[in-house]
Each structure stands twice: as structure tokens, then as C-alpha cells.
Regions:
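A cross-family "folded-core" feature that marks the main globular domain of proteins
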Residues: 1-97
């Protein structure tokens, strides 16, 4: 994770130079989060040989329920549902804490 953050930070610095604009802290933070998550998803999907969603739902029902309860207000406010694939990412972050 540290290496990815450093690489993304460097890339954002280079991008700022290319476009001739200094990004605000808010923009930089949003880009860090978005790009790091994007890279992780691309790496994980490249290595995935099967869809683990159903297995995950069966094996981690309690965790799925916890996520649904914890993020209910966010989901309701934005009118979205956190997909199982994203819950797997959240689970992996929590598990590797």
C-alpha cells in the first residue's frame, strides 16, 4: 500500500505539471483514493479466476449484514447499494487491519 500511495502521489504531481494547475488538497485526496482503489480493483480482477460473490455472501453473512447496517444512511442518502464485490474489498481491508 505504501508503494502504491507513493507512486500515485508522484503521478498526481506529474499530472499537475502537465496540465499546469496546482490541485487543491480536496482534489488531491479524492484522486489518491479514487486511483488507489482503481488500481487495486484492476489488479484483483486480473487475478480473479471465479466470481467469489456468492461464496462470500454465504460465508460472511454477518459481515454483510454489518456493512448494510453501518452504511444504510449513506446508501439511502445517495440512492445506491454497495455491491457484494465492494463488500469483499471492505472485508479484506478490515481483515488485514
Amino acid at each position: 500500500p505504501t508503494k502504491l500511495l507513493e507512486q500515485v502521489a508522484n503521478a498526481i504531481d506529474v499530472l499537475q505539471k502537465y496540465v499546469g494547475v496546482r490541485f487543491s488538497n480536496r482534489t488531491c485526496f479524492g484522486l489518491y483514493v479514487h486511483i488507489c482503489c482503481l488500481i487495486e480493483r484492476l489488479v484483483v480482477s486480473r487475478n480473479a479466476e471465479y466470481d467469489p460473490s456468492l461464496d462470500f455472501l454465504n460465508e460472511h453473512k454477518d459481515f454483510v449484514d454489518y456493512v448494510k447496517k453501518a452504511f444504510k444512511q449513506v446508501e439511502d442518502f445517495y440512492g445506491v447499494d454497495i455491491p457484494t464485490e465492494e463488500m469483499i474489498h471492505i472485508y479484506n481491508y478490515v481483515k488485514n487491519n
